[in-house]
Amino acid sequence: MVAKIIDGRAVAQQVRSEVAARIQARLKAGKRAPGLAVVLVGGDPASQIYVASKRKACEDVGFISLSYDLPNTVTEAALLALIDQLNADHRVNGILVQLPLPAGIDNISVLERIAPDKDVDGFHPYNVGRLCQRAPLLRPCTPRGIVTLLERYHIDTFGLNAVVVGASNIVGRPMSLELLLAGCTVTVTHRFTRDLRRHIENADLLVVAVGKASFIPGEWIKPGAVVMDVGINRLESGKVVGDVDYASAAERAAYITPVPGGVGPMTVATLIQNTLQACEDYHDTTMPEA
């Protein structure tokens, strides 16, 4: 068996094109384009790359992009004050604070300060709670992006045994909730899981997000499984690989996401979707006209 490649770049471009078309329709109707405020604290190179891609994506679809680059010496109080300002700004429909934050700033306090209806990353406890209650509003970007890939490839998830490897707040935990909504029987594995191989060998749908290059060998993959690889790992050679050994896994899986070009592009595309959703569902009545 040779797996069918799930092309995240192509689907992400479809999503962006759909959003761009809706923005043009808004502008023709006399409405203002959505606004996304992106806050970057410090000069972490990886964060700078991620933020640049998000800002460019905003501009490409016609959003108003507001940038706030703060030094790593900024105090938590000053960062919270900026978030309060953005919460009250009617031009801003979404607020994104790039993680990780420098030492001395509490991630939880910062994420909780963002108004839930502007939390386009989907990390606020209110939005995670809504997902848990089977009534999602703004959903975490990477898990929602994975669900979009499954939907666009017409992969029927009802009744599947799904295994999530990794239990982070950003991917693993919300991914498990998304898969429950999608009708799967879900197992979440983590660093204390015993006999990881046994769990993976039983997975009809496997989502891996641990940040370890080629951590899952292909021989563990159940024949005919769907493999969603969230990992992005750069080797000393400069090559970027996922958390799953791609070549060997592709010989057993029915569908697989490549790295790069699989899940990654969907994270940014979903951020764009969430920002438009926040604008249309929560802020249209308070936004000034164009």
Curated annotation (Swiss-Prot):
EC number(s) reported in the record: 1.5.1.5, 3.5.4.9
Catalysed reaction equations from the record: (6R)-5,10-methylene-5,6,7,8-tetrahydrofolate + NADP(+) = (6R)-5,10-methenyltetrahydrofolate + NADPH; (6R)-5,10-methenyltetrahydrofolate + H2O = (6R)-10-formyltetrahydrofolate + H(+)
List of residues binding NADP(+): 166-168, 232
Keywords attached to this entry: Amino-acid biosynthesis, Histidine biosynthesis, Hydrolase, Methionine biosynthesis, Multifunctional enzyme, NADP, One-carbon metabolism, Oxidoreductase, Purine biosynthesis
InterPro entries, per database record: Aminoacid_DH-like_N_sf, NAD(P)-bd_dom_sf, THF_DH/CycHdrlase, THF_DH/CycHdrlase_cat_dom, THF_DH/CycHdrlase_CS, THF_DH/CycHdrlase_NAD-bd_dom
Pathway terms, separated by semicolons: One-carbon metabolism; tetrahydrofolate interconversion
Domain of life: Bacteria
GO molecular function annotation: methenyltetrahydrofolate cyclohydrolase activity; methylenetetrahydrofolate dehydrogenase (NADP+) activity
Biological process according to GO: L-histidine biosynthetic process; methionine biosynthetic process; purine nucleotide biosynthetic process; tetrahydrofolate interconversion
An annotated GO cellular component: cytosol
Keyword NADP found: yes
Pfam families: THF_DHG_CYH, THF_DHG_CYH_C
Family the UniProt entry places it in: Belongs to the tetrahydrofolate dehydrogenase/cyclohydrolase family.
Quaternary structure and partners: Homodimer.
Biological function: Catalyzes the oxidation of 5,10-methylenetetrahydrofolate to 5,10-methenyltetrahydrofolate and then the hydrolysis of 5,10-methenyltetrahydrofolate to 10-formyltetrahydrofolate.
HAMAP family assigned to the protein according to its UniProt record, in alphabetical order: THF_DHG_CYH
Name of the protein: Bifunctional protein FolD
Native organism: Sodalis glossinidius (strain morsitans)
Gene that encodes it: folD
